Amino acid sequence: MLSSQAIIFGMLYLVVAAGNIIGNYRESKSIIWITKPLLMPILLLMILFSSEKVNAWLLYGALTFGFIGDVFLLINSQKGNKWFILGMASFMAGHICYFTWFLTFSQPLRIDIPLVVGLFICIAITRWFWKTVHASQHHHTWPICFYCLMIDLIVLGALLTWGHGPLLGTLLCLTGAILFGFSDFLIAMRVIGEPLDDNAMVMLTYTLAQFLLICGILVVS
């Protein structure tokens, strides 16, 4: 259950996220630099003031690494791609925190039909993505492909919660994980020289992903 303070921080997050998306759409560097570093700390405060704190340290870790990754990618946008790997590593650490939370919460583990279906879908999409990235012959091919596995982990982790709490929580977590994967797919396609989007779409899907993951975790727990 969310406290009134947690709800306020959730609403504040959505306002700041909207500001960042508008800043990206208008290509306003000042708005982007002001709003993006605020996103993960606000979500962290939302957890801090919520009444559900099951393994909260893992969520603090996920959002802290998300904050670090956001900062690295901000620097990357100004200095070229030398910060890209550091940003990607930070987000991978955050994904591991999310997956560990899902894994520890979902004990005893159950192999349900949604998990099996999700596994086969992840395998099919990952195989296609790897072929696409390898075809580009980009020098970051292997790190990008490995990162894709981290996205698979949080998708499957969200499905592990099936039957361990309210269905709404699982669906929110799953939607957040899928949006995270889509956001990172857009970034990856840009990195290999095949952009499909603009920065506003990346931030729209990313900010929603983080918000839905946290909301889903709070609901399911």
Model-derived features: positions:
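Polytopic alpha-helical membrane-helix bundles and their juxtamembrane interface segments
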Residues: M1-S221
